[in-house]
Amino acid sequence: MALLLLRMGVSVALLVAFFSSLIPSSEAYDPLDPNGNITIKWDVLQWTPDGYVAVVSLYNYQQYRHIQSPGWKLGWVWAKKEIIWAMNGGQATEQGDCSKFKSNIPHCCKKDPEIVDLLPGTPYNMQIANCCKGGVLNSWAQDPANAIASFQVSVGQAGTTNKTVRVPRNFTLKSPGPGYTCGSAKVVRPTKFFSQDGRRTTQAHMTWNVTCTYSQIVAQRSPTCCVSLSSFYNDTIVNCPTCSCGCQNNKPGSCVEGNSPYLASVVNTHNKDSLTPLVQCTSHMCPIRVHWHVKVNYKEYWRVKITVTNFNYRMNYSQWNLVTQHPSFDNLTTIFSFNYKSLNPYGVINDTAMLWGIKYYNDLLMTAGPDGNVQSELLFKKDPKSFTFEKGWAFPRRVYFNGDNCVMPPPDAYPWLPNASTRVMSSILLPFITIWTALTFLMVYA
């Protein structure tokens, strides 16, 4: 009876754990960037007769995930009947119903405003610091100076003291599609600001923070990249797994043949404002392919060539980045044509590298075609304790492109050393050979 109750208890616990895992959470976990998030900081700087003036800033603390054009969209729901009188450095996408105002019409009267960044070239009297980049928000490791965005908002019909102000709720962040989940606003210590000479400090009247984390599952996106492998010691080229990012279908326009005589007209007439990739017809149907080639074996070093190919006719990837995980990054000696930074997600273990293009040279990955690729070579020093070409050790454990996890080939498909098949066959035949030898011995000497 006790054993039955124990089994029932374990079953219930497993069911609870399973269903609780289905409940949406504001926390997401990326094993290569466990602390990555976008923090929204709301600083109330000035009280007004019917509200306040605040500066809202977005800090992208993600190491390698950035927001590309057409940029971020930040939304929330007002706690009471607040309105937005005016804005600098950003704008609400809709004004809403402001018909009750006879004069001095507000910038936005919606209960749930959605804010976007202003474009580069905006007049100076409409700008503030860290604004007007078209919603582009770079990653913290790649370009920390441009990993911040800000706008100023004048709020009316709101509280005018720390005790009467009500923080907004239900924050949303789009990039521009789904993927981010935001927690509740939390009042924190007021932000302090330092004068240019560093001799005076001022502070906000009130500050609250909102933390938003990204999940590829929440984004409901199919994979956007895949990995192919090859080596100097094996003629086999392991392609991306079939249907890595989708499968070809009979629907016209689902992909474009790279050698089609009508290629230019198809690409030019397609809706370029759409975020849906227009990809070249391949077996994997991914917009991006990362190829890892084990190129040369030296006495004390070994060399790898990485090629990133764009199969998307609809997008140039600006400020692209690549994250790869391999134990030999602790012994990386030289990298050509790319920038490099060690991420160290596990502290002392240096096995994760972030790679990105050199500004004005290859930081822009062009659309699909002859120029739609970037490449680099990496030189590693051999560690006698761990280095081997056996069993696919020389290939990466994980690969991310622009923060998205790429589809890897199955490990049993990796290029093996030429004598690997002989070793495997020998290990299989060894028991049979032993038995046959024993039987022969018995027959002869019995």
UniProtKB/Swiss-Prot annotation:
Gene Ontology biological process terms from the UniProt entry: cellulose microfibril organization; plant-type cell wall cellulose biosynthetic process
Cellular component annotations (GO), alphabetically ordered: plasma membrane; side of membrane
Disulfide cysteine pairs (residue numbers): none
Lipidated positions per record (GPI-anchor amidated alanine): A420
Keywords of the record: Cell membrane, Glycoprotein, GPI-anchor, Lipoprotein, Membrane, Signal
Signal peptide extent: 1-28
Annotated localization: Cell membrane
Stored InterPro entries: COB_C (IPR056900), COBRA_pln (IPR006918)
Biological role stated in the UniProt entry: Involved in determining the orientation of cell expansion, probably by playing an important role in cellulose deposition. May act by recruiting cellulose synthesizing complexes to discrete positions on the cell surface.
Entry similarity comment: Belongs to the COBRA family.
PANTHER family: COBRA-LIKE PROTEIN 1, PROTEIN COBRA
UniProt-recorded name of the protein: COBRA-like protein 1
Gene of this entry: BC1L6
